[in-house]
Amino acid sequence: RPPVTEVESQNYYHFHDNRVLPSHVDEALANSEGWWYKPDFIINDLNVQSAIGYPAHEEVVPLVAGTYAVRGYARGHGNKIIRCEVSLDDGKSWRLGSVTHEGQPTEYGKHWGWVWWSLEVPIAELLTTPEIICRAWDSSMNTQPNTFTWNVMGMMNNCCYRVKIHPRQTTDGRFALQFEHPTIAGPTVGGWMNRAEDVAAAAAVTVAPPPAPAGAKSFTMAEVETHTTMESAWFVVDGKVYDATPFLKDHPGGADSILLVAGIDATDEFNAIHSLKAKKQLLEYYIGELAEEGQEAAASDRATPGPAAAIGTAVPVA
């Protein structure tokens, strides 16, 4: 049964998540001036969202006569979506798409379902524009801004969705258009917001795993898998073994968030959601190398080694 209390939750994440702080407020200022605790900035209602589904990311469309059905989805988070629009000239003019509403509003008049929209666009026109842009409007006449406004949590950014268009020549010599979305789902790098040059620049400042020092201990995966408790919690990231045991009690989200990855290779989970700061902090937990498959762990002292000095939080969530 959910508990009923006289005051709002005092959980760490109630105050330090789901907030949209003013754009001049960075993490340091938010901490020093108590911005996290100002009730005006909590997210209760969500804003209008829309996106382009087709053309899909990296889809190639031959340059032929005819039209292409640009399609996507939108949601008003309770408010009815009344129109969806597409622009081929950076928002100078807009074309009205057809909107399909599935399902009925609730007894309270709320529209919680996604809607689907589409617009037939001449393929020849797609050749003359660098991108396709979409936006939606709800029944309160709210729409999406042209560009996003930075905030420290990166939340509620619902600016117009943009798909870039690149002329290409196919392997058989025909001309075509290839489409590029701003990003792609999951931890994989892709999309026009993560171009190769940006990735290379980011790689230059990425925290590299610590090199294996001479005589470093090595551990088999089977050994790591035995350390899954409050008394001993190990995990693997990028072939390195880390021990977060002393920090379980200090983690603001509780020990469970670390114990979920204890005893496993947490590379994907860790790298997908953690910041550069968190990756620097991770180095303090390093205790040895993961032995390659078929390789015996070092036969040296097997006493559980302790990590370096405490740094304030267990595997930090950023």
Swiss-Prot record:
Pfam families: Cyt-b5, Mo-co_dimer. Its cofactor is FAD; heme; Mo-molybdopterin. The keyword Thylakoid does not apply. It is an enzyme of class 1 (oxidoreductase). InterPro entries: Cyt_B5-like_heme/steroid-bd (IPR001199), Cyt_B5-like_heme/steroid_sf (IPR036400), Cyt_B5_heme-BS (IPR018506), Ig_E-set (IPR014756), MoCF_OxRdtse_dimer (IPR005066), Mopterin_OxRdtase_euk (IPR008335). GO terms for biological process: nitrate assimilation; sulfur compound metabolic process. Keywords: FAD, Flavoprotein, Heme, Iron, Metal-binding, Molybdenum, NAD, Nitrate assimilation, Oxidoreductase. Residues 216-291 form the Cytochrome b5 heme-binding domain. It catalyses: nitrite + NAD(+) + H2O = nitrate + NADH + H(+). The keyword Heme applies. It comes from the Eukaryota. GO terms for molecular function: heme binding; molybdenum ion binding; molybdopterin cofactor binding; nitrate reductase (NADH) activity; sulfite oxidase activity. Heme binds at residues 251, 274. Gene3D superfamilies: 2.60.40.650, Cytochrome b5-like heme/steroid binding domain. Its EC number is 1.7.1.1. Binds 1 FAD per subunit. Binds 1 heme group per subunit. Belongs to the nitrate reductase family. PANTHER family: SULFITE OXIDASE, MITOCHONDRIAL, SULFITE REDUCTASE. Homodimer. Nitrate reductase is a key enzyme involved in the first step of nitrate assimilation in plants, fungi and bacteria. This is Nitrate reductase [NADH]. The lineage of its organism: Eukaryota, Viridiplantae, Chlorophyta, core chlorophytes, Trebouxiophyceae.
